């Protein structure tokens, strides 16, 4: 028993603690089911398309306001008041949702076109023409219907079934759909309708008198009327102007005239009666007769629109107990007027009635007054002495936040300007992670000054009251009034000497509490309404059984849930689907599952129409028209004549797909090859198919693709024949472009009416004298075309597509059995190669011409392959084994061989996928290799209206091979290819920069005389090609025509100024155009387009990056011996010349635009404007968001204008922005890294690369802890630091994971243009307490010293405590005659990118140098999970790892990390010289070394966003390292020096002198002008716009060397 209780208790405790896995699994399952149910419920909502262009905020407004709908925002239609206009359709659908489907409905003033488009045949619209605007609106609705019908007619479509009833009703009985009478006088009849009648009024009840509304509803026997109208509660407060902010509209009232208009746009206004609208708002009962009344009830308010319903009430159904005998006062007074004495008795009888009484009241809530207070504002005119006083509503939280804060100001700080500054700052928003962290107060900026004055006076009065209270009302000789004015005078000083007199005389301020009283307004106003009706009889309520309707609704709900999985389910017409299920007596769930399977391509059936609607399904499955109507007929008859001629005779050309309800069975196998003569004199109508968009394909995907290919041939044949028939019918209307492609021969005169560009046409269309049209296979003699006597005209085309399509149809017809193609079992391999990868070369190396077959799309490609294969003189490639695709299809069976072992298809992805499947089947091969490029131009369906579904375009293959090395493309094009292809694309070309572009002034400027074009000429469009040919250019082709070809030089031309869809960054046509050349490509264009942008980007790619794409063979090196020399710099004293303007000019040339920035008030702007920040988990003390006001001392003003910022003041926002920039949002780029093992390998490489061999093992006899090491550390500390250690007993360690956070007051200047678009964040300092530094400072100081002693100082420089002279000595033995690669590794976000792996590397280095295990573990834990506290700004957060900027190992730790990173990626054994300092590095390698992919390695292993730059001169720690033939000189960056001369933080002249001396120390080398030319080259390498700068270098020397002259660079700010 005890065991059972113990087990029960234990299980219960585990359940409570969350340790019970069964309970946890059940809870998770329950949570999952709940989420699934919720999402299913959301997907079942009605779908509404919102086509108006709206902003993201307005999108959120509409979505939140109408959760009943699933709204899709297309943003495809610009319109006035787009939000309100779009919401109108949502409001209409919401009102119609309230009405039972199919019930007779009156739409008062509605849009009858909207109901027709929705297929609502049960709605009657009353649309009276009350003014001219109504007539215009009604005509617009008619136009929309005509536009819709014309669009259907143009596409040969019919009105969908779900709209047919409504449109038929409108066509036959338009008065049943819409009338132009007012609703009160509408004559619409309800004879055939017996159900309940409903009405809706969408923004139309304004114009119906409220007293007539109930009677009008009763006259139409309306059961319930739903209405929507715009209104605002503030109109009940008798405001003359009210804004509706959400829809950007407003009401203006002038007497009884209420005007509604939209703001910020020019549109018509709407005027209504204010008193009439007020009745609709405030009344509850709308009498209809002496018995019935319509009672109003508000439903909801959405986006400034009020919804309500008017329900028909029979007052005789009221409980009889409410009846009583009372006095009808009106009847009594009326009778008394007739006679007082003689008819008194009669008057009392008439007034005594049986009455029913009821009453109701409505509370109107004023949301804008919630949490608001009424604040008085004061003003006075100094000219007229007229006083004004007004009251405004202001946020209560805002008012008391200001009052409470400024109440803490000291007497001197309590000034009007400080109050105004604080009010401005707290009005701005602070958003943290999308959530408002500081209260958002939307206070009108125009009121801030007046509000600040009120707050100031209110606080002054409060201070005085406190003083009086403290002194127990001992006021002394001064009165209360005098005290108040003393305080005000003290605040204003002598600025307004008569202000007290004016204020008192005008009685603007009363010295009472009421004068500055802040009141709370009422939130509610109640309106009452009373109903009085006579009682006569009782009526029983009817009973309605709704169970059946509920069951049907549940079935439909489940079916729609099934349909909701479709991507386009929002466009599925639910009403038509319901009607279809009812009319066909089909279970909705079964129908839904069939539709989902078909649309998801899971049923073996493909529907080629665009939208999955019931109307399109019906159109696809309906019977086609007969041949007599000129359309193709798909027949299901038995095949009596298995020939194309038989089909022609019957007027039928069969399709491989289904366009009826019976599968095609006319295509059967025929053993003998039929002749093309069967097409001769076939009627043109038998070949023309008017509509090809309703074809249904069945079977596996390959079968469907093959059927679609056959149908594409039929469609192409149909289109070509139809065009020639059109030309014959209207020869005179042929345009110029058509004349170049077609010809028309008049048979009687033997004259060409339209002369064709080619001759000897194989086919044409003949017009007989009987005006009949036939397709004819033409024959020629020496006089031309041989004609017949009954021919009138002959139309020919230069395109051979019809002739080839006829032949292909003849061939493919033989391969069908019972209308179904056979699919080959051969293995299909897709060889996906980049442009120029040698696909043709590979085919020739793999093919065996005795047993294999090569197929290519074009004749030129086939001839080229035969020529290359037979180049040795032995004929191996013939027309039997190297053929074009068209030749193989047209002449199938005529050759000696019909079966091949392997099939090679070049550029196979340019073919129709069904064509590829046919080729594999027809070759009878075992394996087929399809060579293509997935990113180049695919198969293009050029028959408009013919369906080619997207999933048909994907070729089904068994295996994919990739080729990613291009033998053709130069390096810059290879760089572009890497952006388009998966995997690394490499090249073998020696060309680096090959692309360029030129903007031409116009198309007319391109001609062979003034603009000869180099190499092959290409265009994007046929029209540009024809234009160039007409101007005299030769050998012009389109990009599509030369896919697969190679040219040395290419000139790409665009003459079309209008947008061309195929010219886009991700377009395959652009890819093909850029990859045809081997040496150069120049793009001539008349407009800016994406290709220009691509070429400009490629022109800016660094040559070093392009070297990374090159694939080279290894090179042999020969040892060379050169002389040994010692560094000695030539010294030439720099002349002291120049002026301030020289420095300003140089700065503006290097950094254009930076000096024009007015950034003195950037920090103030950030405080006063809205700001949105995204941060990680942290704690913010918002009470410190606004710092207490401080006196700002004037600083010296620089004469040199730079982008230097003013010193910043510490505060929550400033510190938080700095923390986000420096510590938050750290990159996460690294892959999976075995931290311990990888760190050990990296450290091994570090020691092997940098340390001397004899010092790679730690000195065990060396002690890290000694008095000498502590004394050395203490000697470097300030006295304040030593004082902090006075009470530290060193017994225990403080919290080593606790850090403090602060910011530097001066932002760091960047030598780029980012200051023009970014707010520079301050640098942060994250530091330990001095107690921790006292322990670990001496420790790591000794470890650093031991490390630096072990470094191979002849090759490596760890820049710690080194002078510029020592840097010159280190690089002094560089030989400028030896070719070198100067490499710089630029790492972004260096400190915060360091993670656990970096810490592991650093700890391993310290451990090997001798760090004790216990202290190493303590130090490790102190850098793992750390807490940052900023007491000044009120911020507390937690960080994992990262480099702390104020740590004792910050500098040396960063240095060893960058050195370790480079040692792990680069061949350090080949390094000549290397220098490391923090995150800076400079490396000198021999020319031609191979380097790995630095960016990838830095990302995956080191989590660094790194770029490796190859330069001519080094840049290290703000200094240029100039190596020359005599050694090396280090110049301080002159641009950085000029930037510092624009400093705005210099306090006084003494501070300026200290500043000058520090600059002199760092810029000492500028005194030597011997190497200014090399310095110019080095600066120009970094700043492309920098001019030669010797003049500015001399100017810097001049001013820095003269103390008095240097003072002229600044002005005294206190005197300005």
Curated annotation (Swiss-Prot):
EC numbers: 2.1.1.-, 2.7.7.-, 2.7.7.48, 3.6.4.13
Report the InterPro entries cross-referenced here: (+)RNA_virus_helicase_core_dom, Alphavirus-like_MT_dom, DNA/RNA_pol_sf, P-loop_NTPase, RNA-dep_RNA_pol_alsuvir, RNA-dir_pol_PSvirus, Virgaviridae_RdRp
Region listing for Methyltransferase, in residue ranges? 50-458
GO terms (molecular function) for this protein are: ATP binding; ATP hydrolysis activity; mRNA methyltransferase activity; RNA binding; RNA helicase activity; RNA-directed RNA polymerase activity
Q: Does the keyword Transferase apply?
A: yes
Domain RdRp catalytic residues, every copy: 1380-1493
Q: Which cysteines are joined by disulfide bonds?
A: none
- What residue spans carry the region label Helicase? 830-1085
Q: Name one GO biological process term.
A: symbiont-mediated suppression of host innate immune response
The residue ranges of the (+)RNA virus helicase ATP-binding domain are 801-963
Ligand binding (ATP): 833-840
Protein keywords:
ATP-binding, Helicase, Host-virus interaction, Hydrolase, Inhibition of host innate immune response by virus, Nucleotide-binding, Nucleotidyltransferase, RNA suppression of termination, RNA-directed RNA polymerase, Suppressor of RNA silencing, Transferase, Viral immunoevasion, Viral RNA replication
- Which stretches make up the Alphavirus-like MT domain? 72-281
Q: Which Gene3D superfamilies match?
A: 3.30.450.420, P-loop containing nucleotide triphosphate hydrolases
Q: How does it assemble?
A: Heterodimer of a large and a small subunit.
Miscellaneous comment as given in the Swiss-Prot or TrEMBL entry: This protein is translated as a fusion protein by episodic readthrough of a termination codon. When readthrough of the terminator codon TGA occurs between the codons for Gln-1116 and Gln-1118, this results in the addition of the RdRp region to the replicase.
Name the chain's protein.
Replicase large subunit
Phylogenetic lineage: Viruses, Riboviria, Orthornavirae, Kitrinoviricota, Alsuviricetes
């Amino acid at each position: 028993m005890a065991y059972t209780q113990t087990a029960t208790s234990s299980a219960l405790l585990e359940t409570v603690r969350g340790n019970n896995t069964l309970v946890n699994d059940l809870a998770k399952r329950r949570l999952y089911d709940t989420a699934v149910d919720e999402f299913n419920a959301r997907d079942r909502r009605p779908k509404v398309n919102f086509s108006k262009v709206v902003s993201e905020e307005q999108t959120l407004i509409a979505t939140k306001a109408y959760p009943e709908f699933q709204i899709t925002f297309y943003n495809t239609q610009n319109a006035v008041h787009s939000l309100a206009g779009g919401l109108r359709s949502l409001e209409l659908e919401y009102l119609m949702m309230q009405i039972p489907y199919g019930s007779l409905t009156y739409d008062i003033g509605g849009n009858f076109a909207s109901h027709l488009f929705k297929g609502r045949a049960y709605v009657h619209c009353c649309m009276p023409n009350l003014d001219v605007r109504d007539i215009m609106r009604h005509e617009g609705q008619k136009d929309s219907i005509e536009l819709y019908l014309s669009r259907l007619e143009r596409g040969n479509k019919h009105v969908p079934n779900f709209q047919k009833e409504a449109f038929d009703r409108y066509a036959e009985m338009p008065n049943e759909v819409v009338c132009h009478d007012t609703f009160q006088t509408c004559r619409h009849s309800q004879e055939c309708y017996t159900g309940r009648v409903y009405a809706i009024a969408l923004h139309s009840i304004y114009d119906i008198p409220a007293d007539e509304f109930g009677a009008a509803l009763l006259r139409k026997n309306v059961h319930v009327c739903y209405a929507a109208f715009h209104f605002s509660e503030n109109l009940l407060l008798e405001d003359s102007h009210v804004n509706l902010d959400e829809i950007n509209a407003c009401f203006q009232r002038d007497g009884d005239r209420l005007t509604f208009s939209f703001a910020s746009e020019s549109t018509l206004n709407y005027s209504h009666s204010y008193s009439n609208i007020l009745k609709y708002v405030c009344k509850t009962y709308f009498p209809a007769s002496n018995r019935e009344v319509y009672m109003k009830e508000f439903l909801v308010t959405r986006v400034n629109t009020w919804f309500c319903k008017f329900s028909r009430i029979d007052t005789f159904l009221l409980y009889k107990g409410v009846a009583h005998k009372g006095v009808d006062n009106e009847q009594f007074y009326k009778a008394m007027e007739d006679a007082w004495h003689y008819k008194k008795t009669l008057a009392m009888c008439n007034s005594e009635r049986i009455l029913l009484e009821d009453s109701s009241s409505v509370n109107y809530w004023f949301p804008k007054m919630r949490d608001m207070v009424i604040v008085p504002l004061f003003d006075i005119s100094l000219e007229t002495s007229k006083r004004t006083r007004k009251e405004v509503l202001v946020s209560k939280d805002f008012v008391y936040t200001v009052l409470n804060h400024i109440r803490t100001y000291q007497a001197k700080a309590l000034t009007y300007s400080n109050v105004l500054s604080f009010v401005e700052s707290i009005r701005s928003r602070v958003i943290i992670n999308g959530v408002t962290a500081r209260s958002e107060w939307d206070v009108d900026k125009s009121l801030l000054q007046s509000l600040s004055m009120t707050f100031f006076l209110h606080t002054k009065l409060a201070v005085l009251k406190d003083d009086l209270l403290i002194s127990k009302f001992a006021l002394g000789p001064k009165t209360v009034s005098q005290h108040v004015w003393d305080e005000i005078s003290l605040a204003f000083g002598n600025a307004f000497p008569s202000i007290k007199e004016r204020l008192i005389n005008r009685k603007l301020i009363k010295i009472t509490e009421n004068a500055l009283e802040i009141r709370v307004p009422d939130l509610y106003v109640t309106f009452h309404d009373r109903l009085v009706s006579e009682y006569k009889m009782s009526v029983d309520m009817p009973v309605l059984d709704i169970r059946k309707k509920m069951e049907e609704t549940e079935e439909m709900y489940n079916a729609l849930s099934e349909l909701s999985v479709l991507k386009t389910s929002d466009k599925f017409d639910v009403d038509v689907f319901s009607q279809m299920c009812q009319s066909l007596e089909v279970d909705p769930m079964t129908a839904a599952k069939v539709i989902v399977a078909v649309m998801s391509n899971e049923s073996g059936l493909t529907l080629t129409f665009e939208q999955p609607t019931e109307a399109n399904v019906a159109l696809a499955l309906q019977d086609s028209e007969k041949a007599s109507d000129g359309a193709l007929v798909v027949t299901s008859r038995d095949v009596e004549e298995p020939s194309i001629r038989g089909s022609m005779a019957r007027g039928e050309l069969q399709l491989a797909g289904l366009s009826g309800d019976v599968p095609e069975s006319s295509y059967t196998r025929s053993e003998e090859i039929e002749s093309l003569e069967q097409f001769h004199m076939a009627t043109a109508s038998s070949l023309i198919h008017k509509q090809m968009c309703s074809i249904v394909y069945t079977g596996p995907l390959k079968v469907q693709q093959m059927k679609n290919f056959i149908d594409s041939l039929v469609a192409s044949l149909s289109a070509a024949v139809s065009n020639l028939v059109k030309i014959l019918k209207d020869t005179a209307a042929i345009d110029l472009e058509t004349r170049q492609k077609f010809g028309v021969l008049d048979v009687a005169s033997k004259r060409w009416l339209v002369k064709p560009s080619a001759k000897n046409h194989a086919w044409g269309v003949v017009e007989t004298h009987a005006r009949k049209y036939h397709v004819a296979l033409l024959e020629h003699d020496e006089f031309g075309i041989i004609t017949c006597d009954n021919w009138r005209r002959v139309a020919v085309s230069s395109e051979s597509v019809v002739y080839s399509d006829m032949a292909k149809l003849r061939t493919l017809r033989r391969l069908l059995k019972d209308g179904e193609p056979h699919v080959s079992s051969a293995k299909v391999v897709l060889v996906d190669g980049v442009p120029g990868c040698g696909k043709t070369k590979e085919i020739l190396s793999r093919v065996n011409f005795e047993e294999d077959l090569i197929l290519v799309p074009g004749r030129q490609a086939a001839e080229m392959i035969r020529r290359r294969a037979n180049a040795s003189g032995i004929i191996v490639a013939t027309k039997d084994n190297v053929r074009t695709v068209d030749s193989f299809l047209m002449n199938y069976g005529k050759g000696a061989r019909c079966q091949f072992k392997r099939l090679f298809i070049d550029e196979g992805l340019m073919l129709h996928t069904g064509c590829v499947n046919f080729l594999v089947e027809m070759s009878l091969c075992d394996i087929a290799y399809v060579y293509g490029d997935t990113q180049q131009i695919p198969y293009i369906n050029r028959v408009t209206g013919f369906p080619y579904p997207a999933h048909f375009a994907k070729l089904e293959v068994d295996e994919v091979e990739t080729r990613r090395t291009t033998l053709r493309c130069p390096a810059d094009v290879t760089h572009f290819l890497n952006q388009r292809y998966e995997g690394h694309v490499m090249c073998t070309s020696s060309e680096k920069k090959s692309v360029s572009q030129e903007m031409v002034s116009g198309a007319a400027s391109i001609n062979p005389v003034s603009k000869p074009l180099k190499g092959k000429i290409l265009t994007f469009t046929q029209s540009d090609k024809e234009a160039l040919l007409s101007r005299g250019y030769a050998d012009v082709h389109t990009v599509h025509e030369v896919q697969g070809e190679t040219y040395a030089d290419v000139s790409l031309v665009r003459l079309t100024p209008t947008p061309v869809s195929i010219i886009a960054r991700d377009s395959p046509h652009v890819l093909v155009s850029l990859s045809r050349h081997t040496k150069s490509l120049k793009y001539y264009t008349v407009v800016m387009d994406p290709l220009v942008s691509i070429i400009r980007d490629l022109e800016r790619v660094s040559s070093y990056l392009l070297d990374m794409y090159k694939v080279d063979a290894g090179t042999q090196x020969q040892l060379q011996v050169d002389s040994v020399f010692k560094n000695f710099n030539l010294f030439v004293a720099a002349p002291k010349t120049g002026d301030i303007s020289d420095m300003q000019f140089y700065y503006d040339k290097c950094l254009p635009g930076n000096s024009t920035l007015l950034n003195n008030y950037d920090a103030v702007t950030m405080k006063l404007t809205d700001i949105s920040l995204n941060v990680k988990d942290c704690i913010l003390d918002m009470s410190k968001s606004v710092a207490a006001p401080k006196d700002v001392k004037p600083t010296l003003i620089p004469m040199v204008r730079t982008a230097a910022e003013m010193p910043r003041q510490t505060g929550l926002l400033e510190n938080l922005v700095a923390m986000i920039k420096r510590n938050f949002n750290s990159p996460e780029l690294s892959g999976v890294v075995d931290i311990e093992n990888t760190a050990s390998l990296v450290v091994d490489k570090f020691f092997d690369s940098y340390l001397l061999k004899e010092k790679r093992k730690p000195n065990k006899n060396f002690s890290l802890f000694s008095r000498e090491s502590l004394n050395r550390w203490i000697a470097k500390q300030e006295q304040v630091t030593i004082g902090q250690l006075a009470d530290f007993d060193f017994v225990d360690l403080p919290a080593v994971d606790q850090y403090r956070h602060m910011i530097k007051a001066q932002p760091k200047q960047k030598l780029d243009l980012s200051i023009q678009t970014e707010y520079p964040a301050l640098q942060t300092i994250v530091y330990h307490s001095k107690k921790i530094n006292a322990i670990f400072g001496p420790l790591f100081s000794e470890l650093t010293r031991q490390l630096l002693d072990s470094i191979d100082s002849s090759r490596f420089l760890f820049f710690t405590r080194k002078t510029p002279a020592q840097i010159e000595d280190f690089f002094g033995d560089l030989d400028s005659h030896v070719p070198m690669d100067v490499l710089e590794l630029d790492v972004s976000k260096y400190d915060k990118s360091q993670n656990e792996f970096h810490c592991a590397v650093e700890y391993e280095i310290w451990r090997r140098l001798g760090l004790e295990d216990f202290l190493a573990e303590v130090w490790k834990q102190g850098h793992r999970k750390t807490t940052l506290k900023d007491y000044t700004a009120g911020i507390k957060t937690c960080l994992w790892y990262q480099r702390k900027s104020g740590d004792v190992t910050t500098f040396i730790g960063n240095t060893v990390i960058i050195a370790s990173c480079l040692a792990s990626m680069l061949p350090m054994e080949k390094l000549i010289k290397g220098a490391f300092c923090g995150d800076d590095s400079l490396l000198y390698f021999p020319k031609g070394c191979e380097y790995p992919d630095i960016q990838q390695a830095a990302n995956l292993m080191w989590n660094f966003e790194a770029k490796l730059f190859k330069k001519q001169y080094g840049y290290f720690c703000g200094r240029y390292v100039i190596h020359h033939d005599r050694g090396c000189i280090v110049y301080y960056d002159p641009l950085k020096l000029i930037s510092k001369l624009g400093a705005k933080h210099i306090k006084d002249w003494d501070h300026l002198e200290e500043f000058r001396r520090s600059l002199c120390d760092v810029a000492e080398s500028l005194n030597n002008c011997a190497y200014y030319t090399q310095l110019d080259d080095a600066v120009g390498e970094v700043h492309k716009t920098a001019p030669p700068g010797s003049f500015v270098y001399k100017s810097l020397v001049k001013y820095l060397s003269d103390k008095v002259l240097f003072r002229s660079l600044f002005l005294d700010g206190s005197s300005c």
